[in-house]
Regions:
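Charged, low-complexity intrinsically disordered terminal segments
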Residues: 2-148, 157-168, 174, 178-476
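Short loop/turn segments at beta-alpha junctions that line or gate ligand-sensing/allosteric surfaces
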Residues: 154
């Protein structure tokens, strides 16, 4: 018996060591930028600059957009898209929950599937396990015959050695006409009319007037097909047949009826073209689809575009960089006036990002950027890069090591002075709500800045966390 216990202890110890190596140490072996992708990005940049050179010679682009910064609007636009779907819906999301807004989306998807629309739902395995495994509403949707649900890198014994590779994408595709892409997850924190416990964020709605011929829509479709068929994506099977979920289907139907009463145009909205504006060009950039280490493709694309400008504004919830990423910031700041807007520690909703900023603040400033510590009413989850007055890069990518090397990420590179002006207006307000900290250490409070001091409990919490997170900052 003693020998058995000893052997079992050794086996468990070896297994834990292997898990630690695979999930903590191996992700430290960062992949480097590739020259092949650098050529692709350079071609993308050249194509965009050609559009800028002579607008008169460019045929009118079929892509029209609407920028969504309000959480309730974000829910309404999703419901409109789903409510007007005729053939097919694709929803890919990192964090879907069966809360008020999340169950509203489930209800809309069920209603669409019930009238014959084919629904494909792709969810990351972590939050599916945490928030949906026990949801009968979700299980009912899975059982619907016109719905197929797949899970990216599900939490199973077979996948225990790749826990840190997550799908961070957030997009919705409807038919061959439109998509919505941005930084919002599918839950009450990001969608709906709640006023507390929320994050501010941004989506881009793209409406295609050419019926499926838009470049960015085709790029997103191609990306979806690649990730949908990845090796570490598994089909979610229903526990029971549809008849078992009669009560849940009634609940979903009631939920959808309530949404139709509250938002009366979600099935008959027809002002897609009137409520959007034309853009010159949209290009999708991604980080790869594999559940494994990634090349820093999105950051490469951002750097390439930023180096063409004289002014660069980076909006990110937090900054967690390694040597290469600091080098990118320094290279950009040497060429352009570079501002980085991030949540102030006193306001940020992510304790890991806030803690790393306390540890790394001077390194960020040493790159030559000007930091803006934002004290917004709600934590800001938006991710955007503005280059001069015409280029906007919007999507799911945070300026951190997880987004750069571990997770799937999507960003839209949009050539549009109108969008740039719209986002810039928001960023200007954010900067007025911030404390400006220049690379030489000078500080200045914006006209709308509201000072807040961390209470003693939080100060103690961050003091302890600052020590703990150092070895794991590449995973935050």
């Amino acid at each position: 018996m003693k020998k058995f216990i000893k052997r079992l202890t050794i086996i468990i110890g070896l297994l834990l060591a292997a898990l630690f190596i695979a999930n903590v140490l191996f992700p430290c072996l960062y992949k480097h930028p590739t020259s092949e992708y650098a050529r692709e990005v350079s071609q993308m940049e050249e194509n965009i600059r050609e559009v800028q050179k002579d607008h008169a010679e460019v045929t009118e682009n079929s892509e029209r957009i609407y920028c969504i910064d309000d959480n309730e609007e974000a829910l309404i636009w999703r419901l409109r898209m789903i409510g007007n779907a005729k053939e097919r819906i694709v929803l890919a999301t990192f964090d879907l929950r069966a809360d008020d807004s999340g169950s509203g989306i489930l209800a809309a998807l069920y209603h669409a599937a019930d009238r014959g629309v084919q629904v494909q739902l792709l969810i990351d395995g972590i939050y599916q396990k945490l928030f949906l495994d026990g949801s009968k509403l979700f299980q009912a949707l899975v059982a619907q015959e016109n719905v197929e649900v797949r899970i990216y890198n599900p939490i199973t014994l077979m996948n225990m050695f790749r826990l840190n590779y997550r799908m961070h994408d957030k997009y919705l595709i409807v038919d061959d006409r439109m998509y919505l892409l941005g930084g919002r997850n599918t839950n009450d924190i990001f969608l709906g009319d709640k006023k507390t416990g929320i994050n501010a964020d941004r989506d881009i709605l793209m409406y295609d007037t050419s019926c499926g011929e838009s470049d960015s829509l085709l790029q997103l479709e191609d990306y979806f097909q690649r990730i949908w068929n990845e090796d570490h994506v598994s089909k979610k099977k229903s526990h029971h047949g549809q008849e078992y979920y009669a009560e849940q289907y009634d609940e979903l139907a009631e939920k959808y009826d309530a949404l139709k009463k509250k938002y009366t145009d979600i099935e008959n909205y027809d002002s897609w073209e009137a409520d959007t504006f034309a853009v010159d060009k949209i290009t999708l950039v991604d980080n790869g689809t594999q559940a494994g280490r990634k090349n820093p493709q999105v950051l490469q694309a951002i750097e390439t575009m930023a180096l063409q400008g004289e002014e660069v504004i980076i909006q990110t919830p937090y900054v967690i960089c390694n040597t290469y990423m600091y080098g990118v910031l320094e290279t950009i700041s040497q060429k352009a006036d570079t501002k980085v807007i991030l949540n102030a520690v006193e306001k940020g909703s992510n304790p890991w990002g806030c803690t790393d900023y306390l540890n790394q603040k001077q390194k960020i400033l040493d790159t030559g950027v000007t930091a803006y510590e934002l004290m917004n009413e709600h934590a800001v989850h938006s991710k955007a890069v503005l280059v001069d007055d015409d280029i906007s890069i919007v999507g799911s990518y945070n300026l951190d090591m997880r987004s750069t090397y571990l997770d799937t990420e999507l960003m839209l590179v949009i050539e549009s002075p109108e969008l740039n002006e719209q986002i810039r207006a928001t960023e200007n307000i954010y900067m007025e709500k911030s404390k400006e900290i220049r690379s030489d250490g000078q500080e200045k409070e914006g006209s709308l800045y509201e000072k807040k001091i961390l209470n003693q409990k939080k100060q103690m919490f961050y003091s302890v966390l600052r020590i703990f997170v150092r070895p794991f900052r590449h995973l935050l």
